[in-house]
């Protein structure tokens, strides 16, 4: 805020932050009983917050503050995802070391968090590059290895030549296969790598997605697709090569089509393909220079190998084809051109036979020479299996073909955690010529990083003194593993460390973690759907199987926040020059304005464009609230007799009800809208000469409480102006002091009536109304409406079947016909006495809008012609002039 009304946002925000800190407002004691656990994905230590950070952390701070005011103990911690290649690169560029650079970044970001007033329990701060943290990465590695979930193998890995490190499959992005960090095209390289066997949990990771009711559907679908379970069969084909026969297993989901397999295909890096390349220059040329798995058309080359179709006994040619991938299925497949689009295209380009072995059920005919028939159907040209459905054929063929068996394949691959960089957790293994790879004993952990060495390639390889050590098993010379762990290991369990950050004999206190976990609300970007979120689920399940946790899922509810876009509606970026500095906004308008703007602009999961006008509007709203708080008498009593005061009091109660519902749903934008409308009403009502100061004071107090989770500094200042006890941050969340169950109906009645008055004034061209009469319908019409609600189709007959209504003659009959025409969407009218009372309470709104007195009359108090126009829920209106 600016300097108006004595509000120096900089001084006041710093003062309240100091007071919260001095009072330990946000600390949760270790003996808390299952506190509400609210967590935002901890930030990478870049040193600078952007507006996306502000939004992300404002979301959880608002929720945590609301939960605390609503009576919960709340765990809302913060830490630092501080390992990783960017820090190493920054250190190289600045001729420093990654630790110094990272610590400087953490200090800067902590200052920015504190300036924004985020309420964290800083006593629980964790930093992943701290040896006291990463020793437990190493301890968990040993535990996983002892459980058979870690293996080392030579593997073709994704290699980023720019970062000079291995990437997990999840870190290779898009069809162009670019590095997730630097957008460099990724290549392949064979290296000895350490893997976590995530595939051992593939079924559970997939099946338990159905239980993640609090997760967005798109994230669950992304994980399902990434795990990619496919049910099928593995069937052996005997391949005949010049140097001998070999059985090769092919995986297929369509074993029912095996009689139509007219060729066999191998991946370019399959051992038999590599052997064929050594014998044949054409095959070698294809493998080395032509094969393109990402090409638009399938390509291949015939080899000197043939295969025996186990269903027909026929010899079929074997091709090396670029559409066969070694890491999908078995790296070998039977090709059925008549029933697969890719195989069909390949067969046409290589003049291979195309045979139909499945036909549609019924009389439909297809020509597989023109296009493949890819649906299930009835087997034809399949010998003894003719006439079986595809499903029956698959079952029978699996039973009958020697060596065939049902199988499941996954797209999910084991998680390669080895990284050839310095700034990460050293993998706790030493390599001994006699003993092989040996785990570093737990009592020797942590294996700390040596001093940083400026070098190309892996700096740990250059740390000679650190690298050479003794074997823990035999005492002989050994060499440390020089790879470090993927930084996603750090973030796969950090939420557990927050429960006991200073524990020095275990990664976390098991009893407390079982009490406080899972995280109740987790907030972060959707880009982590198949990396961090999947790995965290894997870790949690493994820890449960190691008897360290009672639960098997880490996050009860997940919110993926949308982006803050530039004013031009595109993603903020330095290159576009459309970014907004949080520090500048905080300096110019204050932290509360920044927080309020990012939370009122849209639902947390939606994108929205930055708006300077929206910032100014948010700032003005806070200034208006503070002026109200400073201008009311907090000790004023409420006059229950005044209808206008009662209207305002009911609106305040309804706002409490609505805002609470919106906070529960994390619809902060709608909560702010409700409070904004209430504040506008209070300002308008306060301008009346007969305004009840007690009602205004109660409304302002409620507004301050309802807005406190979002704009805490301004609300603390307002709370102090209201002589509130303690901090508003610790005040009790308000509850409605009146029954608001009918508020939607009363609001519709009031707004509809006000709109009708406006229409009459505009249509009649009345410049200066001198009075307004609002006439409610006669009571018999309300009776007729209630009877019509219970009518079973015959509205007129049911209504006129009532003796009292029959005595109303044509008036009742005409109204019954009107109701019949509206059925079943009958008016949702209040009972007559409540309708009149509602209109009497709201009359002041019309009076203040038109500067004219308003009378609310019953039908028998008004002119007959006017009263005859009234219906339940739609009073008759007459505007006087002159």
Model-predicted regions and their roles:
Residues 199, 305-328, 467-606:
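Alpha-helical recognition segments enriched in aromatics with Gly/Pro capping
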Residues 1-51, 193, 203-206, 217-228, ...:
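Non-catalytic terminal extensions that flank enzyme cores
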Residues 19, 23, 27-103, 124-140, ...:
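N-terminal catalytic cores of NTP/NDP-binding nucleotidyl/phosphoryl-transfer enzymes
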Residues 728-882:
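C-terminal low-complexity, glycine/proline- and small-hydrophobic-enriched intrinsically disordered tails
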Residues 22, 95-248, 332-444, 459, ...:
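Residue patterns forming the tRNA-binding/recognition surfaces of aminoacyl-tRNA synthetases
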Residues 60-61, 70-73, 267-361, 366, ...:
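Catalytic alpha/beta core of large soluble enzyme barrels
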């Amino acid at each position: 805020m600016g300097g108006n009304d004595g509000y120096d946002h900089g001084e006041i925000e710093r003062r309240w932050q100091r007071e919260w800190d001095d009072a330990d407002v946000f600390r949760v004691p270790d003996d808390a009983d299952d506190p509400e656990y609210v967590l935002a994905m901890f930030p990478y230590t870049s040193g600078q917050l952007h507006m996306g950070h502000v939004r992300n952390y404002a979301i959880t701070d608002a929720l945590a503050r609301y939960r605390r005011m609503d009576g919960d103990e709340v765990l809302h911690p913060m830490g630092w995802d501080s390992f990783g290649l960017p820090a190493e690169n920054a250190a190289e560029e600045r001729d420093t070391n990654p630790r110094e650079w990272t610590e400087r970044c953490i200090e800067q970001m902590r200052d920015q968090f504190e300036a924004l007033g985020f309420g964290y329990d800083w006593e629980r701060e964790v930093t992943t590059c701290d040896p006291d943290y990463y020793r437990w990465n190493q301890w968990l590695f040993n535990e996983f290895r002892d459980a058979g979930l870690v293996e080392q193998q030579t593997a073709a890995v994704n290699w980023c030549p720019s970062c000079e490190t291995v990437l997990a499959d999840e870190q290779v992005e898009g069809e162009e296969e670019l590095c997730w960090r630097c957008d460099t095209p990724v290549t392949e390289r064979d290296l000895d790598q350490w893997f976590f066997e995530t595939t051992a949990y593939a079924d559970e990771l997939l099946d338990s997605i159905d239980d993640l009711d609090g997760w967005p559907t798109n994230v669950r679908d992304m994980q399902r697709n990434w795990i990619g379970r496919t049910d099928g069969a593995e069937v052996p084909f005997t391949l005949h090569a010049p140097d001998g026969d070999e059985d090769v297993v092919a995986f297929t989901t369509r074993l029912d089509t095996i009689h139509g397999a007219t060729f066999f295909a191998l991946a370019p890096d399959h051992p038999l393909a590599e052997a064929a390349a050594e014998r044949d220059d054409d095959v070698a040329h294809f493998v080395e220079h032509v094969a393109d798995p990402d090409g638009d058309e399938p390509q291949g080359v015939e080899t000197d190998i043939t295969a025996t179709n186990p269903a027909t006994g026929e010899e079929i040619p074997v091709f090396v084809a670029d559409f066969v991938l070694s890491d999908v299925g078995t790296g070998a497949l039977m090709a059925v051109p008549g029933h697969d689009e890719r195989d069909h295209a390949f067969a046409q380009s290589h003049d291979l036979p195309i045979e139909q072995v499945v036909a549609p059920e019924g009389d439909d005919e297809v020509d597989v020479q023109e296009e493949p028939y890819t649906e299930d159907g009835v087997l034809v040209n399949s010998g003894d299996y003719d006439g079986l459905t595809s499903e029956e054929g698959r079952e029978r063929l699996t039973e009958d073909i020697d060596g065939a068996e049902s199988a499941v394949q996954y797209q999910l691959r084991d998680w390669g955690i080895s990284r050839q960089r310095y700034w990460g957790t050293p993998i706790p293994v030493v390599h001994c010529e006699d003993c092989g790879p040996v785990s570093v004993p737990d009592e020797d952990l942590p294996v700390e990083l040596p001093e940083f060495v400026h070098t190309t390639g892996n700096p740990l390889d250059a740390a000679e003194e650190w690298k050479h050590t003794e074997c823990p098993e035999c005492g002989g010379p050994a060499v440390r593993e020089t790879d470090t762990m993927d930084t996603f290991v750090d973030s796969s369990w950090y939420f557990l460390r927050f429960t006991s950050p200073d524990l020095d004999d275990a990664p976390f206190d098991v009893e407390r973690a079982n009490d406080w976990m899972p995280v109740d609300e987790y907030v972060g970007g959707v880009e982590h759907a198949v990396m961090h979120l999947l790995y965290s689920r894997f870790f949690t399940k493994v820890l449960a199987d190691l008897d360290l946790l009672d639960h098997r899922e880490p996050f009860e509810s997940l919110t993926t926040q949308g982006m803050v876009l530039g004013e031009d509606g595109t993603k903020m970026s330095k290159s576009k020059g459309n970014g907004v500095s949080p520090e500048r906004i905080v300096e110019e308008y204050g932290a509360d304005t920044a927080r309020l703007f990012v939370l009122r602009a849209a639902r947390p999961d939606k994108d929205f464009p930055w708006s300077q006008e929206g910032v100014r509007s948010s700032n003005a709203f806070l200034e208006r609230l503070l002026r109200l708080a400073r201008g009311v008498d907090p000790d004023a009593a409420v006059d229950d007799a005044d209808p206008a005061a009662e209207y305002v009091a009911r609106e305040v109660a309804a706002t409490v009800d609505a805002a609470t519902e919106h906070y529960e749903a994390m619809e902060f934008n709608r909560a702010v809208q409700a409070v904004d409308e209430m504040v506008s009403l209070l300002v308008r009502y306060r301008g009346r000469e007969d305004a009840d100061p007690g009602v205004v004071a109660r409304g302002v107090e409620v507004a301050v409480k309802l807005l406190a989770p979002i704009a805490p500094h301004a609300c603390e200042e307002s709370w102090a102006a209201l002589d509130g006890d303690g901090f508003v941050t610790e005040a009790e969340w308000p509850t409605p002091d009146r029954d608001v169950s009918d508020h939607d109906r009363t609001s519709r009645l009031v707004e509809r009536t006000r709109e009708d008055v406006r229409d009459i004034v505009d249509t009649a061209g009345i410049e200066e109304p001198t009075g307004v009469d609002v006439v409610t319908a006669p009571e018999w019409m309300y009776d007729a409406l209630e009877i019509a609600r219970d009518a079973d189709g015959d509205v007129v007959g049911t209504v006129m079947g009532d003796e009292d209504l029959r005595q109303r003659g044509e008036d009742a009959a005409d109204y019954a016909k009107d109701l019949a025409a509206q059925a079943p969407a009958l008016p949702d009218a209040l009972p007559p006495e409540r309708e009149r009372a509602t209109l009497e309470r709201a009359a002041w709104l019309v009076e203040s809008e038109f500067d004219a007195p308003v009378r609310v009359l019953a039908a028998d108090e008004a002119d007959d012609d006017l009263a005859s126009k009234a219906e339940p829920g739609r009073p008759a209106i007459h505007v006087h002039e002159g």
